[in-house]
Structure formats: C-alpha cells, structure tokens
C-alpha cells in the first residue's frame, strides 16, 4: 500500500485510478514470429508498422488489430515503445494478448513474410488499388508507415500491392491508426 504522495510520484497521470503493478516485459525481438506463421491453420494476417511514433496511435492500432483478428504485429526497431504508459492505457489490455515483435531490419522481415507466402499490401497515398477492391485470398500483411511521412520508400517498394483509401474533401491522409 502506497501513500497518496508516493502514488502520485510514481504515477504518470494526474488522476490515477489507484491501482498499480510491476511486471516483467516480454522479449519482443523478431526471432520467434516466423513460428506463428507455421502454427496458423488459416491465412495469417499481419500488420507491419514502420516507425510509428505516437503512443496513442500505437495503442489504438494494437487494440483495433486484436478486434479485427490480426495474427500478430511486426514493428520496426524505431517504433514507439509498446510499454509506454499511454500506449498501454489506450490498448485497454490488448497489449498483453496481441503477439508483438520488434524487427531490427524491417525490410528483411517483410522479405521473410513474402518468402513464407504472405502477400504484402502497402498503405500508400499513391496506391493503385482501392483497399476494399483488393482480393485477400492468401496470407496477408498490411504495411503501415509513420504518422507524418508514411512508409519509408525502401519498405514500400517491397510490397506486392500498394493500396489506398479514397478520401473526399480536402483530406490528404488519415491517421496511421485508421
């Protein structure tokens, strides 16, 4: 039991809920994610995140991915820490259930997905295929880029297909979490 003063000191929010725990972080390096492809009886469905920086966006992506049935999320080494307090809060617990890995070399990770028969789709402003017109008949990986800059060119060029979300009005792009 902590005093209010100590609890306020160790908490990162102004109005904490009064519950806190200390846990050991899982090793989230990409060495084990290939095994998940082999275990999948159906078509695996991955997200590949390139340099996401906003903790709230990362949390929303993780939570939405769990709800959508994503098999796992592969992240570039320069993505925001999934154990950032804001990320954890915004996942509403999904961070503890969703398989997550950091890849030291995201390009090599995408190449490995492709070697495993996974079709890769880059979310890209110059996409030639509208996202809901693509045929998702095999294992799938969506490549999603940084909030301000999108996918790095070297990552985008590895994708089998570039997809886009058509937008009305004067909107140029959507939040990475969408």
Specify the residue positions occupied by each region the protein language model found:
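Structured adenosyl-cofactor binding patch, chiefly the S-adenosyl-L-methionine
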Residues: 18-21, 64-68, 82, 87-95, ...
């Amino acid at each position: 039991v902590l005093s209010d003063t100590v609890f306020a000191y160790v908490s990162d929010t102004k109005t904490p809920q009064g519950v806190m725990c200390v846990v050991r972080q899982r090793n989230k390096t990409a060495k084990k994610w290939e095994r998940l492809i082999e275990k999948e009886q159906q078509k695996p469905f991955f997200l590949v995140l390139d340099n996401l920086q906003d903790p709230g966006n990362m949390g929303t992506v993780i939570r939405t991915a769990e709800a959508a049935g994503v098999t796992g999320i592969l992240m570039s080494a320069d993505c925001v820490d999934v154990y950032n307090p804001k990320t954890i809060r915004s996942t509403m617990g999904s961070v503890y259930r969703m398989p997550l890995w950091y890849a030291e070399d995201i390009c090599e990770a995408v190449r490995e997905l492709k070697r495993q028969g996974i079709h890769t789709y880059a979310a890209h402003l110059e996409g030639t295929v509208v996202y809901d017109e693509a045929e998702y008949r095999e294992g799938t990986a969506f490549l999603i880029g940084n909030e301000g800059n999108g996918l790095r060119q070297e990552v985008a060029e590895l994708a089998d297909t570039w997809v886009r979300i058509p937008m009305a009005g004067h909107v140029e792009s959507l939040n990475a979490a969408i």
